[in-house]
């Protein structure tokens, strides 16, 4: 987080954190020491471990936030963290999302989000691990040349269109550009993406950074 602050990162979309309620106070204090507020996604099943998967960190000085803006948000699997912020003269909805890796769970989760306007308002800026790609021709390289199982990617794209957003990477580089956020010896994929309003937006995108790197803290 010290590195993020020094490099002027205003928003961090984090997924698959697996932190439970016992981590809330510790993570809140850690973020605030580095100048960030945190929206900590937690599983809404209070009878279980309360583990979550999504977190959203926003730089307090950029958005005129205070420690009081840190919060926990329950959702199915803790997979969504949402914050409405004011930037310049614009109201921005920021959403961190973790889409399930299991194909059946992915389908059910995406269907639930189709009309979830409270957690994911139309025109949001959505950063997430989607566990499927936009276009397997350009977003996947398999060393063995096999077929990538991109199940329910069409549903994912339908949801993003319903939210009036499109892929920021394609906005910047064109829809035939190649890049990968997760790389192994066998496969490279662009699972991690940012979506933003596709028309009538006052935002100008210059660059963004995504990776699938494990963070230990």
Where are these regions (language model features)?
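Surface-exposed cleft-lining segments at the edges of enzyme active sites
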Residues: 95-107
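Metal-dependent phosphoesterases centered on the DNase I-like endonuclease/exonuclease/phosphatase
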Residues: 2-46, 108-200
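A short catalytic or substrate-binding loop motif that flags glycine-/basic-rich loops and adjacent residues
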Residues: 46-51, 73-78, 103, 173-174, ...
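Short, charged, solvent-exposed linker or helix-capping segments at domain edges/interfaces
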Residues: 65-72, 107, 204-208
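Structured beta-strand-rich core segments of catalytic domains in phosphoester-bond hydrolases
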Residues: 15-93, 97
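Generic beta-strand hydrophobic packing signal
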Residues: 17, 68, 83, 97, ...
